[in-house]
Regions:
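Walker A/P-loop
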Residues: 301-324, 460, 486
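Conserved pre-motif I regulatory segment
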Residues: 273-309
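Accessory nucleic-acid engagement/destabilization modules that flank
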Residues: 2-271
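Conserved interdomain linker/interface between the two RecA-like ATPase lobes of SF2 helicase motors
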Residues: 505-580
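Post-DEXD/H (motif II) to motif III coupling segment of the RecA-like Helicase ATP-binding lobe
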Residues: 445-451, 458-533
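A substrate-engagement module of RecA-like helicase motors
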Residues: 353-421, 427-431
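C-terminal helicase lobe and adjacent C-terminal extensions/tails of nucleic-acid helicase motors
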Residues: 494, 544, 554-625, 648, ...
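Conserved Walker A/P-loop ATP-binding site and its immediately adjacent core
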Residues: 335-357, 369-380, 489-493
Length: 899
């Protein structure tokens, strides 16, 4: 090892590791010197990692215990030593030339242009092509030098790949000069004595040890990211540009790391499960499903899968949370993530959980509840719940209120949001954990030791279902339980879900074959067993909704006007936005229904208007509204299916797949009311028996290819599987009603069962749909990570251009703005005004209608892009005013040309 005496440090011709910077000011006013030496930043991050193990943050000490290092001090020293390697790629001359402070001996060389390679990949290359041969750098072990190098090789991607993806493996690279390599070697040799207790376990080179390291590398690599993030904060680690003794700086940065550790909220203490009333005081008598999960034997070791299939009103959500609390209280998890199909359903579930979730933990604990989806910052209730994680452990704890909240540290990034004890969000946020998205390892860490609770899983298409199966398999392999909720699943769907769990547990479990009257149903799968349970049904959730048929829009309009004349509230659920806008205009033009009694709700509204309309919809049609519901009409699209708890006297729906019609019918006479619409506590509903009227093509026993498209062109585009649409109409005509729960399985299997027979007229389209089904699943499988190689170089291509959790058409964001006297302002007012002014539409729709709008252009647009940090190539700002000809109105939304 080269020692660096003062004379050497002052020699302008000799480069030492004190001549390499790691962080710069980058416009930050405070934070210490102009730059931070690379050696000090490396030790800052190492100190964070050392203390994270000592405190068992995110289960780090538990992971090392699984790896055979049960002594916390020894494990902490190994992790700190490993973190000293995380930025060795920054010793590259190509990186150092990005910033050349005059005090350092590295000056601008003759060569200025280097291939752009991340310092993560540079560091991994330096290990493979130089440092791996420096035996003196490696910890002690009983393993031979060759085997020890092979073991450390597995850990190098974990530490160098700390920017959200593993490093790339490269062979030809000339970004390092010889003195750069020597400085990196000298630094790593200098820090080695700081960690005298490290001893590499010999079994790490066994097949079992290698497999375990690869499995845990996904989680440990995420903690490297967290150590680097916090270790880079100048709030705790101010920049230091001058050399000093390594041991002295290590002691100094350990003290700083103690303070930085307070950004991680303390692990909450779980409360015992003391019965259903602790969680839900309003439940006097559990539903049969809730009683079933109360009685269920959950004592088996290892992960468990629960599939709860029951009707609307059976208390599935409460049953799932009861089950989750029982599992958490039994030490089988520390928290849960509740995944829902849409942002609207996630927002609604967040509101419900706010009243319940603290009961999962002891009163003195301070757990976090996080809303995780891309627009969560626009939800006022969530923003009000934030408390600063930085203040935990401060000298003013009495200033912090012990109410529900979520650590700001968790909330400032969707990447970290899943790390909170309780998460609520779109299922996509969890699915991204098993796909090659950047920082997927942070999501995996967040889901570790958590129950995955997914609702409305019947709504997943072939692509999403395949990714969900990959997520279930990964959760099971990690020893985590899964709870799935659905109205009804087909046998094929259930088979695939159970098979995914079985792969994760390396078992042979198979889903039971269910008959058409096996409903409601609870499927319980463990590592070695499958148990099925029939669930009883309460009389008050047994319902029969008769089905009627309409064959023209004129018939539908007449039925709406008739309902209004009788003082009833009614909805028409259309399959396309354009159809909804068109019929809304027709109803207004006829003048029979006053504009004040007519609502329009679809997806092409700005976020601010959409929130307003949803609030108004609940006020008019919600559970507790009575007088204001009379003679009210809402024309809407699929946004109404899952997002809001509304109760309608009558309903018309465009023909759609049977599972969606069942979902829509759930909004028809949802709560018990008297003849005047007043809510009743119990007894019979006094309104006319519920009837779902369906606008559909005239029935044809032998339909042709154009059967659906010729009658309902827009609906045919939205739901291209016309054979399933025809099967839906057939089974509903045969049954004459939607009878729940008795006919639920029959309805689903009659449309989605593997043995259904399609008419000859749909032969070509059916072949196309079957081909699309397998193509979509194949694409999803391509995007689900193969975790077996571990967090390693070149395991998958990260961030492919079209990577998405959903195989829907790409959408674009449009910003609405006003421009008065040259001043550009957002359409919305209040907090997050620009975000609340966004409308999202299909890219093809925008391409077709773009020329119908006035757009912000020129210098004003350029300045807006700079201010809002938007890409000018991607951003679109629509100028709006009070004139509806501008293409947007608060009443109709983004219009375009509606036929």
């Amino acid at each position: 090892m080269r020692k660096y005496p003062l004379s050497l440090l002052k020699d302008k011709n000799i480069v030492t590791f004190f001549d390499f910077w790691g962080k710069t000011r980058r416009g930050e006013k405070d934070g210490g010197d102009d730059y931070h030496l690379l050696c000090w930043h490396s030790l800052d991050v190492a100190a964070m990692g050392y203390l994270m193990v000592k405190r068992n943050c995110f289960g780090l000490a538990d992971y090392f215990r699984q790896l055979g290092i049960s002594d916390k001090e020894q494990a902490a020293q190994f992790f700190a030593w490993l973190l000293c390697w995380h930025d060795i790629g920054k010793f590259a001359r190509s990186f150092q030339q990005l910033y050349l402070p005059p005090e350092l001996k590295i000056q601008e060389g003759a060569r200025k242009n280097y291939e752009k390679i991340s310092h993560s990949t540079l560091g991994y290359w330096l290990w493979n092509h130089y440092l791996s041969e420096c035996q003196e750098l490696l910890p002690s072990s009983s393993l031979s030098p060759r085997k020890l190098r092979r073991v450390i090789e597995m850990w190098m991607p974990v530490t160098t790949g700390h920017h959200g993806r593993p490093p790339d493996r490269m062979d030809e690279l000339d970004n390092f000069l010889p003195e750069d390599k020597a400085a990196a070697r000298d630094f790593l040799l200098e820090i080695k004595p700081l960690f005298p207790l490290i001893e590499i376990p010999a079994f790490w080179d066994d097949d079992e040890g290698i497999e375990l390291i690869k499995h845990l590398s996904w989680y440990i690599s995420a903690t490297v990211v967290l150590a680097d993030w916090t270790g880079s904060s100048t709030r705790f680690f101010p920049r230091v540009a001058h050399p000093m003794d390594i041991k002295s700086y290590w002691q100094k940065t350990l003290i700083q790391a103690q303070n930085a550790l307070t950004v991680f909220p303390l692990k909450a203490k779980v409360a015992p499960f003391n019965g259903i009333n602790t969680l839900f005081p309003f439940i006097e008598n559990p539903t049969p499903l809730q009683q079933k999960v109360l009685d269920l034997d959950i004592s088996q070791q290892g992960p468990q899968l629960f599939i709860l299939e029951d009707v609307t009103g059976a208390g599935k959500t409460e049953a799932a949370l009861i089950l989750a609390h029982r599992l958490i209280a039994a030490g089988k998890a520390q928290g849960l993530f509740f995944g829902l199909p849409t942002m609207a359903t996630a927002n609604a579930m967040y509101d419900r959980l706010v009243k319940t979730w603290l009961a999962f933990y002891s009163p003195e604990s301070r757990p976090s509840l996080v809303l995780a989806h891309s627009a969560r910052t626009l939800m006022d209730r969530f923003n009000e719940s934030l408390w600063s994680g930085d203040l935990v452990g401060s000298e003013e704890p009495d200033e912090q209120t012990f109410s529900q909240g979520c650590a700001a540290w968790f909330a400032d990034s969707n990447k970290k949001a899943l790390l909170a004890e309780i998460g609520v969000g779109t299922l996509d946020q969890a699915m991204m954990a098993v796909m090659p998205f950047k920082h997927n390892n942070l999501r995996l860490l967040g889901l570790s030791n958590k129950i995955l609770l997914a609702d409305e899983i019947h709504a997943c298409d072939a692509y999403m279902s395949c990714i969900l199966e990959g997520l279930i398999e990964r959760q099971a392999r990690g020893g985590n339980s899964v709870i799935l909720l659905s109205a009804t699943l087909s046998q094929q769907q259930r088979d695939k879900l159970v098979a995914a769990f079985a792969r994760g547990t390396e078992g042979q479990q198979e889903a039971p074959f269910l008959e058409k009257d096996d409903y409601p149903w609870l499927t319980h799968v463990t590592k070695s067993d499958v148990n099925s349970h029939r669930v009883a049904t309460r009389k008050d959730v047994e319902r029969s909704v008769s089905v009627g048929w309409l064959h023209s829009e004129q018939e539908c309009i007449a039925r709406i006007e008739s309902a209004v004349s009788q003082g009833k509230c009614i909805a028409w659920i259309r399959n396309s936005v354009d159809d909804a806008i068109k019929v809304h205009r027709q109803l207004l033009a006829r003048g029979v229904i006053p504009a004040s009694s007519l609502s329009l709700f679809h997806s092409r509204f700005a976020f601010s208007d959409r929130q307003r309309i949803e609030t108004e919809t609940l006020a008019r049609f919600g559970k507790y509204c009575s007088l204001q519901r009379a003679s009210q009409v809402i024309v809407c699209t699929q946004v109404i299916e899952q997002s809001v708890d509304i109760d309608l006297d009558e309903m018309i729906s465009d023909l759609a797949p049977v599972d969606l019609l069942i979902q829509r019918a759930g909004r028809l006479q949802r709560h018990i009311r008297d003849i005047n619409g007043q809510l009743k506590r119990d007894g019979k509903d006094e309104r006319s028996p519920p009837e779902l009227l369906i606008l559909a093509p005239v029935w044809d026993d032998s339909p042709g290819d154009e059967w659906f498209g010729s009658a309902m062109r827009n609906s045919a585009f939205v739901y291209p599987d016309h054979g399933r649409i025809w099967l839906t109409q057939r089974v509903l005509r045969e049954q004459g009603a939607i009878q729940m729960p008795h006919a639920a399985r029959l309805l689903i299997e009659s449309v989605y069962g593997e043995d259904v027979v399609m008419p000859e007229g749909f032969a070509r389209s059916e072949q196309e749909q079957v081909g699309k089904y397998y193509c979509d699943r194949a694409m999803a499988k391509k995007f689900v990570l193969n975790f077996r190689p571990g967090y390693a170089a070149n395991i998958n291509d990260y961030l492919p251009e079209k990577l998405s959790t959903r195989l829907a058409e790409e959408s674009v964001s449009l910003w609405l703005a006003t421009c008065i006297d040259g001043v550009v302002k957002p359409y919305a007012t209040g907090a997050h005004a620009w975000e609340m002014s966004v409308v999202r539409v299909r890219r093809s729709w925008w391409k077709k209608h773009r020329d119908e709008f006035s757009l912000l252009e020129g210098e004003a647009f350029r300045l807006w892009c700079i201010e809002q940090r938007q890409d000018p190539e991607m951003a679109n700002v629509i100028l709006v005013n009070d004139d509806e000809s501008c293409g947007y109105s608060a009443t109709e939304g983004l219009i375009g040309k509606v036929g």
